[in-house]
């Protein structure tokens, strides 16, 4: 992407009204959510695109750095850093990544060009204790909406390992 697109901070997300943002980022690459003539990005999406040099984020007159956006994200969500690492890893692999909060997970993951997502991804730290009930509930929801539940485990070095969780019938 040649031209850096301006976005403006608005609460816990950023937006742009530029047609180029809508065309290049939303329509062509699956970023953000379109509401009227505005493209809204989550702070995780904004951090990713800032790190790639595709956008800049303004808070009034002040331009925010990647670290500023991550810091804002961590104020809203203490796990922002690990969720960002998983988001970045999936995007770098060519997948489209959207929120899955309504499904009790962190991300819905689509193959490029797919209309429906294949996976629901739940992000955890390697040191985090997991309840069997949490895993079962998420796997049940994923199964109910015909998705595969994936556990994304981030270790202390920031490496991500993915585990597929599915029902087995005997």
Swiss-Prot record:
Q: Which GO terms describe its molecular function?
A: lyase activity; nucleic acid binding; tRNA-intron endonuclease activity
What domain of life does the UniProt record list for this protein's source? Archaea
GO BP annotations of the record are:
tRNA-type intron splice site recognition and cleavage
CDD domains in the record: tRNA-intron_lyase_C
Q: Could you name the active-site residues? A: 110, 116, 147
The question of whether Lyase is a record keyword is answered with: yes
- Keyword Phosphoprotein among UniProt keywords: no
EC number(s) recorded for this UniProt protein: 4.6.1.16
Q: How does it assemble?
A: Homotetramer; although the tetramer contains four active sites, only two participate in the cleavage. Therefore, it should be considered as a dimer of dimers.
Query: What is the name of the protein in this document?
Result: tRNA-splicing endonuclease
Which gene does this sequence derive from? endA
């Amino acid at each position: 992407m040649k031209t850096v697109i301006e976005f403006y901070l608005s609460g816990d997300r950023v937006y742009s009204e530029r047609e180029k943002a809508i065309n290049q980022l939303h329509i062509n690459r699956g970023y953000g959510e379109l509401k009227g003539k505005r493209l809204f990005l989550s702070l995780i999406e904004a951090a990713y695109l800032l790190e790639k040099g595709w956008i800049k984020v303004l808070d009034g007159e002040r331009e925010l750095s990647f670290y500023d956006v991550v810091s804002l994200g961590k104020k809203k969500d203490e796990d922002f850093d690990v969720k960002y690492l998983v988001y970045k890893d999936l995007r770098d692999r060519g997948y489209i990544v959207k929120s899955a909060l309504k499904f009790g997970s962190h991300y819905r993951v689509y193959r490029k060009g797919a209309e429906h997502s294949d996976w629901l991804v739940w992000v955890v730290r390697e040191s985090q204790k997991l309840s069997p009930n949490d895993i079962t509930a998420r796997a049940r929801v994923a199964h109910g909406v015909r998705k595969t539940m994936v556990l994304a485990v981030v270790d202390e070095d920031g490496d991500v390992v993915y585990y597929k969780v599915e029902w087995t019938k005997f």
